[in-house]
């Protein structure tokens, strides 16, 4: 009789949990939608300014492709790497998740390092002309998001040190970091196309 009551209590608790889903992922998605609108505004303004100028970018503010292309490959690859971490935690492999998330954070740091190197070697600054202004604002805003993404990943790694904090059934924080990182990746692909590819052809 007692076992039956306990089983019923467990079932009720499970049903109750299903009635109250974790809204953190939904909150993240709403945040990313708002960020997408901000980036969309920047993209629209950039394209409008480009259409108003016969020569784009203006002479003396050309961009190089070598470092940004390497950076792009690193960031795209990191999206696959972080996904391996999500796969690992779904198999209750916390150590594997940590490994892949460490690698992702390192790749993000290398990306930022490449971005800083590019800034130092471009030969023009934020106020040189309208293209330079767009370039620094857009890539800098994206770089800020990459930095935030690295912090989120490191936060997941830190919290995973607590036994049982993440497992195959409870890994919302891991999933949120992955979703955010994929968002950062997609935004960069658009930026790379606008600022580097389309300005060379």
Swiss-Prot record:
Topology with respect to the bilayer: Multi-pass membrane protein
What is this enzyme's class at the first EC digit?
translocase
What is any one of the record's Gene Ontology cellular component terms? plasma membrane
* Alphabetic keyword roster: Cell membrane, Membrane, Translocase, Transmembrane, Transmembrane helix
Query: What's an example Gene Ontology biological process for this entry?
Result: aerobic electron transport chain
Catalytic reactions of this protein: 4 Fe(II)-[cytochrome c] + O2 + 8 H(+)(in) = 4 Fe(III)-[cytochrome c] + 2 H2O + 4 H(+)(out)
**Alphabetical list of Pfam families matching this protein:** COX3 (PF00510)
List residues traversing the bilayer.
25-45, 65-85, 100-120, 137-157
Q: Which Gene3D superfamilies match?
A: Cytochrome c oxidase, subunit III, four-helix bundle
Task: Give the location in the cell.
Answer: Cell membrane
One GO molecular function term? cytochrome-c oxidase activity
InterPro entries tied to this protein: Cyt_c/ubiquinol_Oxase_su3 (IPR024791), Cyt_c_oxidase-like_su3 (IPR000298), Cyt_c_oxidase_su3-like_sf (IPR035973), Cyt_c_oxidase_su3_a-hlx (IPR013833)
Q: What is its main location?
A: membrane
E.C. code: 7.1.1.9
Instruction: Name the family the entry cites.
Output: Belongs to the cytochrome c oxidase subunit 3 family.
Name the PANTHER family on file: CYTOCHROME BO(3) UBIQUINOL OXIDASE SUBUNIT 3, CYTOCHROME C OXIDASE SUBUNIT III
> What's the protein name?
Cytochrome c oxidase subunit 3
Provide the species name. Thermostichus vulcanus
């Amino acid at each position: 009789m007692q076992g039956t009551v306990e089983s019923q209590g467990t079932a009720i608790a499970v049903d109750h949990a299903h009635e109250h889903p974790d809204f953190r992922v939904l909150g993240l998605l709403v945040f990313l939608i708002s960020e997408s609108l901000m980036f969309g505004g920047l993209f629209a303004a950039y394209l409008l300014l480009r259409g108003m100028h016969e020569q784009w970018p203006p002479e003396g503010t050309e961009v190089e492709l070598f470092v940004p292309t390497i950076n792009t490959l690193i960031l795209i690859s990191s999206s696959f790497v972080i996904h391996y971490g999500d796969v690992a935690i779904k198999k209750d492999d916390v150590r594997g998740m940590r490994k892949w998330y460490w690698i992702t954070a390192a790749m993000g740091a290398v990306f930022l390092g490449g971005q800083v190197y590019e800034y130092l070697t471009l030969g023009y600054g934020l106020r040189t002309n309208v293209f330079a202004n767009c370039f620094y604002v857009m890539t800098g805003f994206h770089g800020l998001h990459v930095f935030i993404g690295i912090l989120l990943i490191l936060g997941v790694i830190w919290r995973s040190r607590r036994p049982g904090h993440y497992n195959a059934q409870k890994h919302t924080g891991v999933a949120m970091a992955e979703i955010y990182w994929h968002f950062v990746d997609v935004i960069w692909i658009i930026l790379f196309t606008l600022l580097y590819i389309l300005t060379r052809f």
